[in-house]
Amino acid sequence: MRAKLSPVSIVAEIAAALMLAAVPAAAESTWDQIKRTGQLRYGAVDYPPNWYRDKTTGKWTGFAVEMVEDVAKEMGVEAVPVETTWATCVLDLQSNKTDLQFGLQATPKRALVIDFAGPAYNLYWYAVNHKGFKASTWEDYNKPEVKVAAMLGSADVVILLKVAPKATRVELNDVASTALAVTSGRADAMVTAVLGALVAKNRNPDLGDFVLPTPVVYLPSYIGLRREDNNTLQKFLQAWAEWNNLLGYTEARIKKYLDSAGATNVPENVRF
């Protein structure tokens, strides 16, 4: 015989059921999402030798592509490129458009909204001058009459604001545009990491001096990822970055794609 429930008991049961229904389901972690979909989505920026796309096939190549493909292989999933820019790649991570982004400097502003693993490698910051323009220190560029091109939304702009805040900045969407600004005389110089600077100099013989301004700027480059409570992906990427650096795989990949881009004039003091 079923016992009768008192009105108080009925109310209590209903309240408990409502409370359970109100508890949101736990958000799926990025790691679990990648495993479920079988896809690791990565941001691909038009910035050789990190990433560059074959105009005929549409296929992305570059050392950062090879790195992501190795990460995907270790995870047992497929690497899927998602075209982005330096100005939008952090937003793409936040909005779940991509799962990771190679080639990011961990600036304080970025660290407020995303997490990082690494460093994956380290980079010097170079300037490539217009022919006829001479400069060798950051102070030489730190003048209002000196126009310096840099990529919009990139760490190049952040660094330029620190080392040459008085320079007149010419902010453009990609490295090809910054190089064109210098060769055309719209800018006196361009500033970017050594990899992009080497490729730009090789592809544009009309560019002038390739300069490592002093004091030297040498910064680590990280893998950016979405901020979340579950840090499984972050821990995995941290281990992956350390392992590949210790065994020399990272430097070998970078030099391989510099060579394929024809940028063989790497200064002896440059290490990645």
Predicted regions and their residues:
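Short helix-initiation/N-cap motifs at beta->coil->alpha
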Residues: 65, 80-91, 135, 170-180, ...
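A ligand-binding cleft/hinge motif common to bilobed small-molecule-binding domains
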Residues: 88, 104-113, 159-162, 188-217
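Periplasmic-binding protein-like
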Residues: 46, 122-129, 198-241, 260-272
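Ligand-binding clefts/hinges and TM-proximal coupling segments of bilobed small-molecule sensing domains
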Residues: 29, 155-172, 209, 241-272
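Ligand-binding cleft/hinge of the Venus flytrap
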Residues: 51-56, 68-78, 138-142, 156-173, ...
